[in-house]
């Protein structure tokens, strides 16, 4: 039992909806995705949780309160009893909506400052893993989204091109490169009309695998003219929103 409350507070923004973020505190596969293989959670009041770190250290606790998708509270202590005995500290996670997705607020209450100081870097690291685990799930289809963007860019048929853009982009999408400074879906669609008017037959194709980190995606591309000759190449940085849709594209020509 906690005899005094020394707090560690940390806040991060996750590019995902609260309901999705909350799954990483209630689903054992998602829980293990950011804590490590063998970690489990029974997300009901009185349910048990286990954290199994890669170095063999084990943490266990009991779920005290669950209010999906806004709040979960659980005890936190080490199986060895050191530096925190079982039941010796308490973690509260609060989730709120945010323009970018979800605001996560963590409060870890300890019995003394030494315990708190021991966990400052640990939570900084662990919540970084958490942010990546959530983003990897939300954006599991990022490569397909990127390919659909390049396909839309290359599509000479306005109806199908615009339908693709509606499906993969946000209404306020922004696009920047050496030939573009665009704001909003209508602006992007008009730009694509001009592309096909002045450069008929030009297409963009992805080259190699995408690289993804927390809703930011890098994709290399090549521009191929109607005659099959390469006309340029470069890299695009895509920023995805909380639903995995394209919110921003910045192109860098090689």
PLM region spans:
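Residue-level recognition of conserved beta-strand positions in structured domain cores
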Residues: 53, 76, 106-108, 177, ...
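A solvent-exposed, acidic/Ser-Thr-rich amphipathic alpha-helical stretch
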Residues: 18, 37-52, 59-61, 67, ...
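A beta-strand edge to alpha-helix "cap/lid" segment located at domain peripheries
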Residues: 81-133, 190, 194-254
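Amphipathic alpha-helical segments
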Residues: 15-33
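Short acidic-aromatic low-complexity motifs
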Residues: 15-19, 139-171
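Short amphipathic
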Residues: 6-14
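Hydrophobic pocket/interface hotspot
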Residues: 21-22, 31, 49, 63, ...
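Short, solvent-exposed secondary-structure boundary/capping segments
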Residues: 70-77
């Amino acid at each position: 039992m906690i005899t005094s409350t020394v707090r560690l507070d940390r806040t991060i923004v996750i590019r995902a909806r609260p309901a999705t973020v909350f799954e990483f505190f209630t689903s054992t596969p998602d829980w293990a995705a950011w804590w490590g293989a063998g970690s489990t959670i029974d997300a009901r009041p009185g349910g048990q949780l286990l954290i199994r770190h890669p170095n063999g250290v084990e943490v266990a606790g009991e779920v005290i309160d669950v209010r999906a998708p806004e709040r979960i509270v659980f005890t936190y202590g080490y199986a060895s009893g050191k530096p925190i005995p079982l039941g010796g500290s308490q973690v509260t996670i609060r989730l709120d909506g945010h323009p970018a997705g979800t605001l996560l607020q963590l409060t870890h209450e300890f019995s003394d400052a030494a315990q708190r100081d021991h966990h400052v870097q640990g939570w900084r690291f662990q919540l970084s893993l958490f942010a990546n685990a959530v983003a990897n799930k939300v954006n599991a289809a990022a490569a397909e989204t990127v390919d659909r963007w390049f396909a839309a860019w290359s599509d000479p048929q306005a109806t199908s091109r615009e339908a693709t853009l509606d499906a993969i982009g946000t209404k306020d999408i922004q696009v920047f490169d050496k030939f573009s400074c665009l704001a909003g879906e209508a602006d992007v669609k008009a730009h694509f009309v001009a592309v096909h008017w002045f450069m008929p037959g030009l297409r963009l194709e992805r080259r190699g695998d995408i690289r993804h980190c927390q809703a930011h995606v890098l994709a290399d591309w090549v521009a191929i003219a109607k005659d099959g000759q390469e006309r340029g190449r470069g890299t695009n940085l895509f920023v995805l929103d909380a639903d995995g849709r394209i919110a921003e594209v910045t192109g860098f020509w090689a």
